[in-house]
Regions:
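Core catalytic region of metal-dependent phosphoesterases/phosphodiesterases
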Residues: 1-37
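Acidic, His/Gly-enriched loop-helix segments that form or flank divalent-metal centers
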Residues: 38-147, 151-157, 163-176
Length: 177
C-alpha cells in the first residue's frame, strides 16, 4: 500500500470491526465463518479469491489460504492498524467510546463495535470522539461526538473531518455514486 502527498501530517489508520473479523477468519476460518456473511465474501472477491460458497472445513481452509496469499503486504498493513488514536482532547475510533471512561480505559470491543451509552449520553470530560460505524445522513457534531460515517458502502459518500487548533471542524465528503 502506497500513500503519497502527505506533507504536514503522518496518517493514522484505524482498525474496524470488519478488519478484526477478517483477521480472526484468517486465524480460525471455521470458528469465524460469520465474517463471510457481513462483507467477507465481497472482500474475498475484491482480492480475486473465489467466494467460499461451501461452508465445510475444507472450503473455508482453502478460502483462508487463498486470501492470506492474495492479501500480501496488505495483511501487514491491516495488522498494524490501531484501535484508537488520541491527539489532545480528540480520540479517533472506529465505532464508539464508553462515555463514562477516559481514553486510556476503553475496552477494545467498545472501540470496534460500540457502546449502548455512546449515542445516548454526552461526554462530560471535554473529550471529543471522532467515529464511524453508525451511519448518519450528514456528518454531525454533538455531545462530544463527531460522526463521519455517511454510509459509503451504499451511498457512495465517504466523509472525513479535518480538525485543526483554533479552527472549526471541516467536513470533506465525496459526491457519491
Amino acid at each position: 500500500l502506497e500513500i503519497s502527498g502527505w506533507s504536514e501530517v503522518e496518517p493514522v489508520f484505524l482498525m474496524g470491526n470488519h478488519e478484526q473479523m477478517m483477521l480472526r477468519f484468517l486465524a480460525e476460518p471455521e470458528r469465524e465463518a460469520r465474517w463471510l456473511r457481513v462483507g467477507g465474501l465481497q472482500t474475498l472477491m475484491s482480492y480475486g479469491v473465489s467466494a467460499a460458497s461451501e461452508r465445510g472445513p475444507e472450503a473455508l481452509a482453502a478460502a483462508r489460504e487463498a486470501l492470506a496469499e492474495a492479501l500480501g503486504p496488505h495483511l501487514d498493513f491491516v495488522e498494524a492498524t490501531r484501535f484508537a488514536h488520541l491527539s489532545g482532547n480528540v480520540l479517533c475510533v472506529h465505532a464508539a467510546a464508553d462515555p463514562a471512561l477516559g481514553p486510556e480505559d476503553q475496552d477494545v470491543g467498545v472501540l470496534l463495535w460500540g457502546h449502548p451509552d455512546f449515542l445516548a449520553r454526552p461526554r462530560a470530560d471535554g473529550l471529543w470522539v471522532v467515529h464511524g460505524h453508525t451511519v448518519v445522513e450528514e456528518p454531525t457534531i454533538a455531545g462530544g461526538r463527531i460522526a463521519v460515517d455517511t454510509g459509503a458502502y451504499y451511498s457512495g459518500r465517504l466523509t472525513a473531518v479535518r480538525l485543526a487548533p483554533g479552527e472549526a471542524p471541516r467536513f470533506l465528503t465525496t459526491l457519491g455514486g
